[in-house]
Regions:
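A conserved amphipathic terminal alpha-helix motif
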Residues: 12, 120-160
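Short acidic/glycine-enriched loop/turn segments that link adjacent beta-strands
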Residues: 58-60, 98-99
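Hydrophobic ligand-binding cavity/cleft-lining segments
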Residues: 2-59, 160
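Hydrophobic-ligand binding "helix-grip"
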Residues: 41, 67-115, 119-121, 152, ...
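Short alpha-helix boundary/capping motifs
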Residues: 57-59, 68, 142-144
Length: 160
């Protein structure tokens, strides 16, 4: 179940989108769905592609590129894992956005509460205006959809 009201905070130019979902699977399974690239691509927005820089890893210092697959442009976010411990992965990114994407698996009685916190700013004022005008609400909706897809992927792993 998704948290009833997604949190959206705008502090100066920094914005925070935070959402959570309850998943009926252990935190280790949920974490595996985030950390393993093949499983990640089962729930990631189909318009996004995550490419490793070097070997794929979610260890601190590991780098990757998130590419938005739109015709002609393919904007890219360069990301680095900056925090990592069991149940937690935090990517820091730069590109048209600058910020952090936090994925935290919190064990609960019947599974896991997965928290996704996207803290960012858009440095370019023209791109910021376009994002806030046209894409901010869609981004939050997509985050909710990704959490629902991740829930399905994680819960399906239990049947294997």
């Amino acid at each position: 179940m998704l948290s009833p009201l997604p949190l959206a905070i705008k502090m100066s130019q920094q914005q925070v989108f935070e959402q959570s979902i309850q998943i009926n699977a252990p935190a280790t399974v949920v974490e595996q769905c985030i950390a393993e690239r093949v499983l990640m691509h089962r729930w990631l927005n189909p318009a996004l592609r995550c490419d490793p820089v070097g070997d794929w890893s979610t260890d601190v210092g590991s780098r990757s590129r998130f590419v938005i697959q739109v015709p002609l442009l393919q904007p890219t976010l360069e990301s680095t894992v900056v925090e990592r411990e069991p149940g937690l992965i935090v990517w820091e990114f730069e590109g048209f956005f600058k910020g952090r994407d936090r994925w935290e698996c919190q064990p609960i009685e019947k599974g896991t509460r997965l928290l996704n916190r996207f803290e960012f700013e858009v440095p370019n004022p023209i791109i910021r205006w376009g994002f806030n005008t046209f894409a901010a609400a869609l981004t939050q909706q997509d985050m909710q959809a990704q959490l629902r897809r991740l829930k399905r992927v994680a819960e399906a792993q239990l049947g294997k």
